[in-house]
């Protein structure tokens, strides 16, 4: 899979929101979710990124999972749109308001080398651990809650 950089092919909707594809990457048994470290600030996030004009949304989700987390996935469910609920002070030119489309996915392979390995760690979390780790990102928490992950 080819890694991409830049936003020259980035999609935006009629409201000016950046269209972002993301995944809730789970183990086959649905007991663990893989989170990655944010590059913008401290904390954990789900793999996600811009949906580009020359790809389908599912392709963007698969590409972002590879680039950011080094995983090969199988998309299982479309979790639908998730509204960006970040307050205006957390938005910027580099992080504009977004409309997220999340997919539940099964992780098939974790690669040892991937495009963003040098700037991100990845870690498996239980549902309760992930809820705590994503507590300051309501849009990511909503995606997790829409998934079929076991709530134990």
Regions picked out by a protein language model, each given a short descriptive name:
Residues 1-22, 28, 92:
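Acidic, metal-coordinating catalytic segment for phosphate/diphosphate chemistry
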Residues 14, 76-81:
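Sequence/structural signature of beta-propeller domains
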Residues 28-74:
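Conserved Nudix-box catalytic region and its N-terminal flanking loop in Nudix hydrolases
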Residues 42-43, 109-152:
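Nudix hydrolase/Nudix homology domain
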Residues 71-76, 142-144:
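Short arginine-rich
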Residues 82-113, 123:
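Active-site-adjacent beta-strand/loop module that shapes the phosphate/pyrophosphate-binding cleft
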